[in-house]
A protein has these predicted regions:
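C-terminal catalytic "cap/lid" subdomain
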Residues: 1-236
Length: 236
């Protein structure tokens, strides 16, 4: 039995690299698809947003001399590549999946709108929402917050390479301690980098809770969905 009926799963592009330095690791992709299938089999309605940092980051491109708008557009295209890859992996695992894009690029994906996304999820498809918000200067964290609010998700699950939110970076500070749950006000007060400020404030204002957890440990996604205390819960 799943704790949540409809979720927004946010995946980082970097996590798709696995052990590689760039691009997509097929083993990691298959592991993610298998984990998503596990919760799909529980009857959960699933929307997904994936970053593009394993291929290109608009902000880092701007720091290297790219026009920021063009750099962000390249980043949006990177998220589409990742979304198509995950869609293919899900189909191979026996799960119906559909890619929606925030900018028109048929036949690569359908143009996104809330009602189409919900219709597809209610029909049992995993919906992967790509190209961010379709606008420059917005991160995929902000895009995932927006989509989670739009599709009326019960929770956003932020799958990362760490097992939750800490008082400091545990890789740099051995005294850092993990939060099992924390309020949005405390996140903002402490300046914790759960997501960028815009994304965090959107979730707070629209009462969308976030669970930050380690997606790279196989089985964790299902454990979260079954109510186990994995990761950190952020709430009002």
């Amino acid at each position: 039995m799943a704790t949540y009926k409809r979720i927004l799963l946010k995946l980082s592009g970097e996590s798709l690299m696995g052990e590689k330095q760039y691009g997509i690791d097929e083993k990691r992709l298959a592991e993610y698809a298998a984990q998503i299938k596990d919760i799909h089999d529980l009857g959960v309605q699933i929307g997904i947003v994936i970053g593009g940092g394993n291929i290109f980051r608009g902000l880092s491109g701007a720091n290297k001399g790219f026009d920021r708008v063009k750099g962000d557009q390249m980043g949006m295209l990177a998220t589409v590549i990742n979304s198509l890859a995950l869609s293919s992996a899900l189909v191979a695992a026996g799960v119906k999946a559909r890619v929606l894009t925030a900018v028109r690029m048929e036949p690569i994906g359908e143009f996104y709108n809330k009602w189409r996304a919900i219709e597809c999820m209610e029909a049992g498809e995993v919906v992967i929402m790509s190209a961010g918000t379709g606008n420059p200067f917005f991160t995929t964290d902000t895009g995932s917050s927006l989509r989670g609010i739009e599709i009326e998700a019960d929770v956003m699950l932020k799958g990362t390479r760490v097992d939750g939110i800490y008082t400091a970076d545990p890789e740099k500070d051995p005294t850092a301690t993990k939060f099992h749950d924390i309020t949005y006000d405390e996140v903002l007060k402490r300046g914790l980098k759960v997501m960028d400020l815009t994304a965090t404030c959107m979730c707070k204002e629209n009462n969308l809770p976030i669970i930050v957890f380690d997606m790279d440990t196989v089985g964790n996604l299902k454990k979260v969905m079954q109510g186990e205390e994995i990761g950190t819960l952020v709430h009002n």
